[in-house]
């Protein structure tokens, strides 16, 4: 049986937690158009990492077979 391919775009965006049971992602809306956003929004709310929702976790794991 051939090796499973990893989706490279997903590999750059997601990584497992230390235990490997959950998946971490970066929050959106912090790349550009930041002038009108408040400091609180940029630093406190958007800087933290977030967990992938349970409903999406299965799809992410299918894209990353060796995670």
Curated annotation (Swiss-Prot):
Entry keyword Ribosomal protein: yes
InterPro entries assigned: Ribosomal_bL35, Ribosomal_bL35-like, Ribosomal_bL35_CS, Ribosomal_bL35_sf
Disulfide bonds: none
PROSITE patterns tied to this protein: RIBOSOMAL_L35 (PS00936)
Domain of life where this protein originates: Bacteria
Record Pfam families: Ribosomal_L35p
Keyword set, alphabetical order: Ribonucleoprotein, Ribosomal protein
GO BP terms, alphabetized: translation
GO cellular component, one term: cytosolic large ribosomal subunit
An MF annotation (GO) of this entry: structural constituent of ribosome
HAMAP family documented for this protein: Ribosomal_bL35 (MF_00514)
NCBIfam families for this protein: rpmI_bact
Family, as annotated: Belongs to the bacterial ribosomal protein bL35 family.
Protein name: Large ribosomal subunit protein bL35
Species, as recorded: Synechocystis sp. (strain ATCC 27184 / PCC 6803 / Kazusa)
Gene: rpmI
